[in-house]
Amino acid sequence: MKKLSILLFVVFSLQVNAQEPEFGLFIGNTYYIGDLKPYSHFSQQDFVVGGIYKNNLSNGRVAFRMNFLYGRVKGNDFESGVEQQLQRNLSFRSSIIEIGPVIEVNFFPYKKGQFETNKEGFGTPYFFGGITYMRMNPKAEYEGEWVELQPLSTEGQGTSQNDNKPYALSQISIPFGIGAKLNLSTRLSLSLEYGLRKTFTDYLDDVSGLYPNQALLAQEAGTLSAALSDRSSSPEGFNDSNYGLQRGNPNNKDWYSFSGLMLTFSLVKKSSCPTW
């Protein structure tokens, strides 16, 4: 809640010089980069949808917007084609709620309502950056049901094996990327955007550290925790051959991408005709 309050303060502070408000929709696709998919951009994609509130400053060079987005990311060792990951056999999906301010900087002056292609201000490329509150919730499929992973302490967090507290589901991320926008009419605008998010957690996929002792984990955190901690184990019982080995790479934080189309509607009708 404290993180969200700070973001809202930033939002209202930036409204002082804002002009030309817009509301809009965002729809697109997602992917993640992390321990289960360390290198492959654009694979194992999922969806993102949400709402946008935007203000274009009167100079035509800068726009401020507030994102309210809901998306989902996923990763699966089985789809990696890497032998070590195939043996590890972990998978996850996580919903992401994202709320936060973003600043767009236009390459060329952009005029809301100017939809004549032969005139300045019709459209422009832009780049953007900001800061967002994100809420994640990694889950894994087990016996036909999706199970929340954070409460299970799959790496022994909060047990006698691991002094670390369970990781936080609420985080801050840094969105940035590029896009292009154009006016469709005096009120409608369309943008195409590619964005990455840098996070400060390595647990978007619930994978980061070492394999715990599975028998002890089952005793202290439950058999379900042990079953989802090491999915390379045989179904007949717990296999502690991986105990103490690297389950993930704690030195690399997780990333995700939200990319797609934005359709925005201006609250103030802007004429494309010159005034006399």
Where in the sequence are the language-model features?
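Bacterial Sec-dependent N-terminal signal peptides
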Residues: 1-26, 267
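Outer-envelope beta-barrel architecture signal
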Residues: 19-23, 60-64, 95-97, 121-125, ...
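Short glycine/proline- and aromatic-enriched beta-strand/turn motifs that initiate or cap beta-hairpins
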Residues: 19-56, 138, 254-260, 264-270, ...
